[in-house]
Amino acid sequence: MTEAATSTVIRDATQADLPAMAEIYDEQVRSSIATFETEPRGAAYLGEKLAHPAPGDFMLVVMRDRVVLGYAYSGPFRPRPAYAGTKEVSVYVAAAARGQGLGRMLYAALLARLDALPDVHTQVAVVALPNDASEALHLGAGFVRVGVLREVGHKFGRYIDSAWYQRLP
């Protein structure tokens, strides 16, 4: 468990956290391009990720005063075996808690765990554009922007580009 301030805690997610995590994610689905989901997924979606982790798959929450304010996770980049050393990472923070450094804290904890695994070589993150805050978060966590895929998503009546970020040892 990592404590960043007196009442801010980062820890492994549990089943009890899933409703709050789903609320954070589903708000992003409904109101932003941070995810290309177009319909809310609910707690069952995140529960599947939590219940069936592969080696190097982590799901962390950040809490303040016992309230889940965000989460980060790592998962497979692609299903083929040769990609096993590459993890895709994501972070989501509740709208009311953004700008407080919680995403940075979550990534620091998540990336430290991944760095400790000899079989995990690199991490990849995908950022829908424009998103200055997310791009700054990834650059600050040691990621490098390696490319942009143009107009690969369609949400809210428009096409959206995705920037690809990679973090190497």
Task: Annotate each PLM feature.
Residues 9-21:
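A short beta-loop-alpha structural element at the N-terminal edge
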Residues 22-49:
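Conserved GNAT-fold acetyl-CoA-binding loop/helix
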Residues 39-96, 107-108, 113, 168:
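Acetyl-CoA-dependent GNAT
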Residues 73, 81, 124-126, 139, ...:
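Conserved catalytic-core motifs of GNAT/GCN5-like acyltransferases
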Residues 89, 123-125, 165:
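A structural signal for short, well-ordered beta-strand segments
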Residues 98, 124-135:
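Conserved beta-strand-loop-alpha-helix junction that forms the acyl-donor binding cleft
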Residues 99-114, 135-140:
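Conserved acetyl-CoA-binding loop-helix of GNAT-fold acetyltransferases
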Residues 114-127:
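Conserved GNAT acetyl-CoA-binding A-motif
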